[in-house]
A protein has these predicted regions:
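Amphipathic, small/basic residue-rich leader segments at the start of a protein or domain
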Residues: 1-101, 370-374
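Glycine-rich phosphate/cofactor-binding loops in nucleotide/flavin-utilizing enzymes
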Residues: 2-5, 87-88, 106, 331-374
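Glycine-rich beta->alpha junctions and the first turn(s) of the following alpha-helix
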Residues: 2-14, 192-286, 352, 374
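C-terminal helix-coil-helix/basic helical segment that borders enzyme active sites and/or dimer interfaces
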Residues: 28-45, 255, 259, 263-266, ...
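N-terminal glycine-rich flavin-associated loop
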Residues: 98-116, 134-137
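A short, Trp-centered hydrophobic/proline-enriched beta-strand micro-motif
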Residues: 120-131
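A short core secondary-structure module
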Residues: 150, 154-193
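Glycine-rich phosphate/pyrophosphate-binding beta-alpha loops
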Residues: 158-163, 239, 351-358
Length: 374
């Protein structure tokens, strides 16, 4: 395995680091700062990026090739390798600002809406609810059957993150054959309803998507099982890469604070308990980095990588959660203030541990593979 970065990959990594530092971290503080000293009674409002700021950031990201990373250049994307995408998502993971390159699967190039999604005029969400639990396709509950000029879809309810999106990519199984299909659904499609929207612990929402004889044209069937597996693996690698960014930011900030903070006449960094925490975290971060880069390298080499991506996601997301916890402990009371990023990282990392395969399910699947190989 040769993980030496190409010249293009180094340039993209540096461009992403500069973009995050100049455009995102510089405004992170104002985003985190509450407008009022005390929140009003009831649920606290969700923090959202100003639409004008978001539009400006999208234009700047597109100019430097940091947008729609997976789509080909012909479709308006960057057409980057898995390694390059991993390096870029790692840099964007260093900030809690809700801005990163969108997940637009390559198969979306076949849709007439691809260009407007890339431009940010339309939004896309992955309605992969059941797959979040195990990362496997055998949990799909939505069903479809052929009907005149297309397909009819039914589902009792699917949890969808970011339910305000214009389109949803939804996997479903054919009622008789059991063959899986991946469909592009318009939120205004007949028979599709979205209700019971609730806030997550992160600055996002989830709602229930129900399909009742939802009729769509045949051109909305974009793929089958192979395409679904590639999307799952791509999301697992994205989560793993973002987790590396979280871990790196938390470790760097924790080291800086421990060196500068003096208690009882001594810097925190001189205390053995602090030294153990940062030592363990640095080892965990390095382990997660190698697992993630190995999975991305396998994908670029055309080698089997689905299990490697799942393992990298599981290890890296847990590392990010632990990194946020360490940063909170070392920063003390500052660590849980909303004007610092660590409590947001903590909540985000906990959610990422649940997405596209929970840890127990991944452990079981990987364990079975190892036992069979032995």
């Amino acid at each position: 395995m040769d993980l030496k970065l190409s010249e293009e990959e180094m340039l993209l990594k540096n461009a992403a680091a500069q973009f995050v530092q100049k455009e995102l971290l510089n405004i992170e503080g104002s985003f985190l700062k509450q407008k009022e000293p005390f929140l009003p009674p009831g649920d606290p409002p969700r923090r959202e990026l100003d639409p004008v700021v978001r539009k400006t950031l999208i234009e700047k990201a597109k100019k430097v090739g940091l947008w729609a990373l997976e789509l080909s250049e012909e479709s308006g994307g960057s057409g980057l390798s898995h390694i390059a995408r991993t390096l870029i998502h790692r840099e964007f993971g260093k900030t809690v600002l809700p801005f990163e390159p969108p997940s637009i699967p390559r198969l979306m190039a076949a849709s007439r809406h691809a260009e407007r999604i890339v431009e940010g005029e339309l939004s896309l969400s992955l309605a992969f609810d059941e797959i979040h639990k195990t990362g496997k396709l055998d949990q799909i509950r939505a069903s479809y059957r052929p009907c005149p000029n297309g397909c009819c879809l039914n589902s009792s309810g699917i949890d969808v993150i970011n339910p305000s999106s214009d389109f949803f990519l939804l996997p479903a199984k054919e009622e008789t054959s059991g063959q899986s299909g991946l469909f592009l659904l318009d939120r205004d499609a007949s028979g599709l309803s979205i209700k019971d929207e609730v806030d997550l612990t992160t600055d996002a929402t989830v709602a229930r998507l129900t399909l009742n004889e939802c009729r769509i044209s045949s051109d909305r069937l974009l793929g089958h099982e192979d395409e679904m597996r590639r999307i799952i693996a791509a999301e697992q690698l994205r989560i793993a890469a973002r987790s590396l960014g979280i871990g790196t930011r938390c470790l760097e900030n924790a080291l800086e604070h421990a060196s500068n903070r003096v208690t009882f006449g001594r810097p925190l960094s001189s205390r053995q308990a602090i030294q153990w925490m940062v030592a363990d975290l640095s080892v965990s971060l390095r382990t997660s980095t190698w697992l993630t880069l190995e999975a991305a390298w396998k994908a670029d080499q055309g080698l089997p990588y689905f299990d490697a991506a799942a393992l990298a996601k599981k290890r890296a997301a847990r590392m990010a959660f632990e990194a946020a916890d360490v940063a909170i402990q070392i920063h003390g009371g500052y660590g849980v203030c909303k004007e610092f990023p660590f409590e947001t990282f903590y909540r985000e990392a906990r959610l990422m541990r649940l997405l596209y395969g929970q840890e127990a399910g991944i452990d079981r699947a990987i364990g079975e593979i190892f036992l069979k190989a032995g």
